[in-house]
């Protein structure tokens, strides 16, 4: 288990303030926050690259020492994939991975290097020097180096930023498989809501150097009532006065040229009286009056009006066929 206890860091101003959380073996923890919230600083503390003014980091009940100390046992089992890549620019792609796997027996090292070259689609550039590769290729190479020795804890600081959709999906599957097979603990920092929601077992929100909330992906999607946190995940924030909530992802709505907000569903949902807070630069509160029975909807909401009453078509409570 990875445990973060009462971590505080300050430079010219407080960056992290009394941060505490735990991640069990095999868990993936998502960490989200705005730029400057302290996410990368926290990863640097966990990886041992930065010593906190206060607090400790524990791995399997062993306290990990500050980086100022000469001996740092345990940090070989915590690997950070930063946004700086940390590659040897004058060595080839294959040599960079081989160096990261240096402590493995020779046969195991060869198999591991070949597997990583194939996994992250680096085989075609295996003989190219790192400083001659693209940003996306350097990102993938950095990930390959980090997981070469199969660490207990993997820290990912915006790891998918330079990967195309196919490589993102491939890396998603590999991370999940590695977590299951080796009980790998992963701390994921990302500005992309889909990364956090798609991979995480728990999501922490970092605001002004403090952890403001902890949510499961389900609760973050359906029951998150903090506007700022909802925006970080790319979710339009909505609630109603009865406490019922429903959420629309960005790919489920669009604003028409006539100023109408189109919400398009291919399934049945329950709605009471919903207060929809739609944000497009300004806050527009719209009350939608509807039946409490399920309905299939492709509704048009006039975001230029404060209130719109709409009668919904009643249907039987079953799922609609997906289009």
Indicate residue ranges for each PLM-predicted region.
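ABC ATPase NBD coupling module
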Residues: 63-79, 103
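Conserved ABC ATPase signature
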Residues: 129-133, 137
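Catalytic Walker B motif of ABC-type/P-loop ATPase nucleotide-binding domains
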Residues: 154-158
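Conserved ABC ATPase "signature" C-loop
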Residues: 208-209
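Conserved ABC ATPase "signature" region
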Residues: 108-125, 177
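Helix-to-loop junction immediately C-terminal to a conserved catalytic motif
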Residues: 47
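A short, proline-enriched helix->beta-strand linker immediately N-terminal to the Walker B motif
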Residues: 148-152
């Amino acid at each position: 288990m990875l445990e973060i206890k009462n971590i505080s860091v300050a430079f010219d101003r407080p960056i992290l303030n009394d941060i505490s959380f735990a991640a069990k073996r095999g868990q993936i923890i998502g960490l989200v926050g705005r730029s400057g919230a302290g996410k990368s600083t926290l990863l640097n503390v966990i990886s041992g690259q930065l010593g906190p003014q206060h607090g400790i980091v524990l791995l399997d009940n062993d306290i990990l020492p500050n980086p100022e100390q000469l001996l740092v046992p345990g940090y070989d089992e915590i690997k950070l994939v930063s946004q700086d890549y940390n590659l040897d620019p004058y060595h080839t792609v294959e040599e960079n991975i081989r160096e990261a796997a240096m402590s493995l027996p020779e046969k195991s090292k060869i198999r591991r290097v070949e597997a990583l070259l194939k996994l992250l689609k680096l085989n075609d550039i295996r003989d190219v020097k790192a400083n001659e590769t693209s940003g996306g290729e350097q990102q993938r190479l950095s990930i390959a180096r980090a997981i070469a020795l199969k660490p207990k804890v993997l820290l990912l600081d915006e790891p998918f930023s330079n990967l195309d959709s196919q490589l993102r999906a491939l890396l998603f599957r590999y991370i999940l498989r590695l977590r299951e097979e080796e009980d790998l603990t992963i701390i994921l920092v990302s500005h992309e809501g889909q990364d956090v929601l798609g991979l995480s077992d728990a999501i922490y929100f970092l605001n002004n150097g403090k952890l403001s909330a902890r949510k499961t992906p389900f609760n973050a999607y359906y029951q998150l009532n903090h506007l700022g946190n909802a925006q970080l995940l790319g979710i339009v924030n909505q609630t109603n006065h009865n406490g019922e909530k429903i959420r629309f992802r960005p790919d489920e709505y669009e604003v028409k040229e006539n100023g109408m907000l189109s919400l398009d569903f291919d399934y049945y949902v329950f709605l009471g009286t919903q207060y929809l807070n739609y944000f497009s630069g300004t806050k527009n509160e719209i009350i939608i009056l509807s039946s409490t029975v399920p309905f299939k909807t492709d509704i048009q909401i006039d975001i230029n009006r404060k209130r719109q009453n709409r009668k919904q078509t009643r249907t039987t409570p079953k799922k609609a066929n997906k289009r």
